[in-house]
């Protein structure tokens, strides 16, 4: 048993997630990155439904995975005057009718939704340089991603990759290819941390 509970809690974020009954994390790894407490894990969301079999009259549960992704939390050791959440635009936006902040960067606004409780402050936090760096990382992401920055400096990064950290998949990659992929995926996450570390 691990005496230290996980730092990362997917339900503690403003990141929009699919409807689900159960949220579970696995493969927690905690460490430091450039002096920042950091934790990564695999998050799985499942939807559980019950149905009754006509033949037997017995109730059964059906569990369906609706989301699997790689998540990282980094404590940036600084405070921010407000929170922000960035998540990808998609067809569901019209259904949710979520209010999104326009940044003035056409490419960023086409690709991402942005929410916060203070539009003026969030646009200072999300400087033009930060937006360009996020757009550059979007080009090399392993899936659709979302970012949630809390006022206390906790930075959540979630990638809907369909697999977890260090999954070997179907065994098509040799050990050298696996190491290279694992390093590339971790580097992507640390590059996103770097976007929010500087002024």
Regions found by a protein language model. Name each.
Residues 1-199:
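Charged, low-complexity intrinsically disordered regions
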């Amino acid at each position: 048993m691990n005496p230290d509970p996980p730092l990362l809690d997917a339900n503690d974020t403003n990141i929009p997630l699919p409807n689900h009954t159960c949220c579970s994390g696995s493969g927690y790894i905690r460490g430091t990155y450039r002096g920042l407490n950091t934790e990564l894990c695999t998050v799985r969301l499942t939807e559980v439904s019950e149905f009754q079999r006509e033949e037997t009259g017995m109730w059964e549960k059906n569990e369906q995975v609706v989301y699997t992704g790689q998540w990282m939390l980094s404590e940036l050791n600084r405070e921010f005057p407000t929170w922000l959440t960035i998540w990808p635009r998609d067809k569901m936006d019209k259904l949710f009718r979520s209010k999104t902040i326009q940044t003035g960067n056409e490419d960023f606004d086409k690709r991402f939704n942005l929410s916060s409780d203070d539009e003026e402050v969030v646009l200072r936090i999300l400087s033009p340089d930060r937006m360009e760096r996020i757009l550059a990382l979007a080009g090399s992401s392993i899936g659709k991603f979302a970012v949630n920055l809390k006022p206390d400096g906790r930075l959540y990064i979630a990638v809907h990759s369909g697999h977890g950290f260090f999954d070997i998949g179907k065994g098509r990659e040799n050990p050298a290819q696996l190491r290279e992929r694992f390093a590339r995926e971790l580097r992507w996450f640390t590059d996103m941390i770097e976007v929010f570390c500087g002024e």
